[in-house]
């Protein structure tokens, strides 16, 4: 069985994340992950409800190292969480909040660094390519939310493909700030896996309001990469406030008009990219709406038509998917 390292190599254990202005090295992150992995209960599934992106990532990779599947709900609504807890065997909840999101399952709270207690070099776990690491859910806009399982190897391939495309647009790896939820496929891929598995740097914040986005960007060193939505982007441009220099901007979740993309590029001075993807497929194509009408698929992704359906195959996809 083929395996992959839990984290890609980083000469000298370079910076992997920023937490409220403080740089966190790859080695420190790895120590956090392995320390938490030792504390995790014996279980098959974890409901990762951390609100801080850094602690979410620590919990996510700790679970991977223990062979535990992260269950990532598409909504924090109590009824949705209750349904997941009732329907998922061998489940516990992980969060950085004082009160547990649910009293139906065991709860483990995290959020206090233990990396300073570690010494020496930590052994890097090797993860089976086909190990299931996450279960994500569709939005339910066309019916009941559907669960989709993801494996480590396929998500690594997807992160590599996104890194190739995005770092090309940005002219090099960046620190990634996201305004989007990281338990959804877009946010997980672009604000957690792209920086950690794709050679960038993760930012712990998830700002919503324009002033908060500008403040969070100002905490980060250049080059900066903003992962957002058309809604957040429009509000940011309308706010008419000073925005720190960006290397590139990425949008998804709703169609990005050419007018808005062009306005963003003119105002922010950075290439404005748009992603095509879904929970089922992950992201499979991009375009630059200001100058491109057609989508450009990721390396290895092939499309073909069967009657009135478009089928995607190859690349990081485990099987053929109808778009």
Q: Where do the PLM segments sit?
A:
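Conserved pre-ATP/AMP-binding loop-to-beta segment of ANL
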Residues: 5-12, 114, 119-137, 169-175
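AMP-binding/adenylate-forming core of the ANL superfamily
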Residues: 302-323
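Conserved AMP-binding/adenylate-forming
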Residues: 36-76, 174, 178-182
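Conserved AMP-binding/adenylation subdomain of ANL enzymes
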Residues: 157-175, 183-225
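Conserved helix-loop-beta element of the AMP-binding
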Residues: 108-110, 155, 175-177, 224-227, ...
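Gly/Ser/Thr-rich phosphate-binding loop
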Residues: 237-293, 302-304
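Conserved AMP-binding A3 loop
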Residues: 22-25, 125, 130-160
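Conserved AMP-binding/adenylate-forming core of the ANL superfamily
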Residues: 5, 10-40, 150-153
